[in-house]
C-alpha cells in the first residue's frame, strides 16, 4: 500500500512538472494561437476575472496564483509572456485532463477572457513591486 501511495505521489509531481513546463502548448491548433483577448488591460475585466478565478481556479492554483503542491504557478514566464492569449483561451476551453486541467468551457467566452485578463494582470502587478 505504501508503494502505491509513493507511486501516486511521484505521478502527481511529474504531472505538475510537465504542466509547469508548458507541454500543453504543443496541443494548441494553429488557428487558435492568434486569438486576441477583447478584455485585455480593462480594469473591470481584471476585477471580474479575479472573482471567476477565485471561484473556479484558486482551489488548484492558489489564491494568489502562485501554485500549490499539486498544481503549477500561473505567474511563470511561460504563462505570463510565452503563451499567447489564444493559447491560454484554448487551454481553458479544452482543458488538458491528462495533466489534471479540466475544461472550463461551461463558463463561456466572456468569463474565460476575464480570467485570462486577471492572470495576465498578475505579471504587471509583480513587475511594479
Predicted regions and their residues:
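Gly/Gly-Pro-rich "capping" loops immediately C-terminal to redox-active cysteine motifs
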Residues: 39-50, 66-93
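Electrostatic cytochrome c docking/interface patches
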Residues: 22-52
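The canonical Cys-X-X-Cys-His
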Residues: 49, 53-63, 115-119
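Bacterial N-terminal signal peptides
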Residues: 3-13
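Axial heme c-ligation environment in periplasmic c-type cytochrome domains
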Residues: 17-21, 39, 68-76, 93-129
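Short, small-residue-rich loop/turn micro-motifs
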Residues: 29, 64, 92, 96
Amino acid at each position: 500500500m505504501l508503494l502505491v501511495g509513493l507511486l501516486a505521489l511521484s505521478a502527481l509531481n511529474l504531472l505538475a512538472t510537465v504542466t509547469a513546463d508548458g507541454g500543453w502548448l504543443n496541443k494548441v491548433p494553429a488557428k487558435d494561437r492568434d486569438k486576441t483577448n477583447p478584455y485585455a488591460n480593462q480594469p473591470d475585466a481584471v476585477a471580474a476575472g479575479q472573482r471567476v478565478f477565485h471561484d473556479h481556479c484558486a482551489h488548484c492554483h492558489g489564491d494568489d496564483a502562485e501554485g500549490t503542491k499539486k498544481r503549477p504557478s500561473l505567474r511563470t514566464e511561460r504563462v505570463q509572456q510565452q503563451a499567447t492569449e489564444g493559447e491560454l483561451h484554448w487551454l481553458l476551453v479544452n482543458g488538458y485532463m491528462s495533466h489534471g486541467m479540466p475544461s472550463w468551457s461551461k463558463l463561456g467566452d466572456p468569463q474565460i477572457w476575464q480570467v485570462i485578463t486577471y492572470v495576465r494582470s498578475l505579471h504587471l502587478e509583480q513587475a511594479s513591486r
